[in-house]
């Protein structure tokens, strides 16, 4: 194995000098010999003169010039297969749950080619989530890519947890959860919630249904940049075995941000808003690998932080292009106390097509959006002139739209500990029946308060009797 010496350290970026004849390839993993814990560098650039520029997969504190580095001759490789289930791993695939080594028989490189065009599957089957607003206006596809867009504190992680609860627990397949640059507390809560739900079995880890890979907020940018690829590699292995896998990534924005932090240190000129010039390429490399093949499927749910609630920011805007369904969370809806704060006018899905969901579902969803859009237009008139100046038909639209807004809310299982209301899973049939009746005016006599935080339309009728 070729050995080199560290010649320069700038934060997360380290330059290493090797003999001219033994320069490592780009993406090779290098081991630092003089380190108490395992410290790996990943080659990013060859600068000439035998010097390579690397990203540190860990903290560079305590490193010094002259320290010996050994080339492994291969990219970072992580354990895959059933041994990873029920375990928490870091970017290098090392266990961080203090329950011993992973002990997997097989390791895969985290840098892999996306499946070729011939291998990809183009079947469309709907995935029911039990969340009314999602199933109605932005239905998910099995094997699709779903983005949860929202600013700080509007409920991305809670929605993600509810989807894990509703899909992963109902769905008998396996899940991989990649925590990319999020709060350690959330990762910890998730682990214990999964134990309570029986998805993680501590005694017999191989009976678990989820593998967890964490690179949290407090970790250096190298870890946050590569941890999404580590989680994806594990999901790809399950898919290639012929399984249907769920991949949850929280949060894709932090992956971009880690790239931005490293990019300037690597000497690249920043592009718009200070992002790395390779933003679209980095996003494409990750997203193109998240795909379904003829062997199995990967359905991914990705939370996307929206800086300053601006959806035109380069990072969320680049992510949009890769998704099949976008669930947009709106701060104004959250401010009204209507949760989940999903905006039915801004959220989209490629599956909302009469050929996929059926004409009936399509008409109901478009009818709901039409009513809400008309109400949005009338709000200015109401603010200036008041309700009395509206025509009878417009008054009816406003009344129905307000009921629809409230009926789109529902209690979540994962929020039960905060609200005290038991969570509800609403089947698609019930969702469609409720909204069809609302649009047809069957429930015009029920007060709008009755529709707040209920499951099916029958719950709203029961609530009306108590008012």
From Swiss-Prot:
| Main subcellular location | membrane
Where along the chain is ATP bound? 150-157
Assigned EC number: 7.1.2.2
Substrates-to-products reaction catalysed: ATP + H2O + 4 H(+)(in) = ADP + phosphate + 5 H(+)(out)
* Alphabetic keyword roster: ATP synthesis, ATP-binding, Cell inner membrane, Cell membrane, CF(1), Hydrogen ion transport, Ion transport, Membrane, Nucleotide-binding, Translocase, Transport
Topology in the membrane? Peripheral membrane protein
Q: Which Gene3D superfamilies match?
A: 2.40.10.170, Bovine Mitochondrial F1-atpase, Atp Synthase Beta Chain, Chain D, domain 3, P-loop containing nucleotide triphosphate hydrolases
Give an example GO molecular function. ATP hydrolysis activity
Which HAMAP family does its entry note? ATP_synth_beta_bact
Q: What name appears for this protein in its UniProt entry?
A: ATP synthase subunit beta
* Gene source species: Vibrio parahaemolyticus serotype O3:K6 (strain RIMD 2210633)
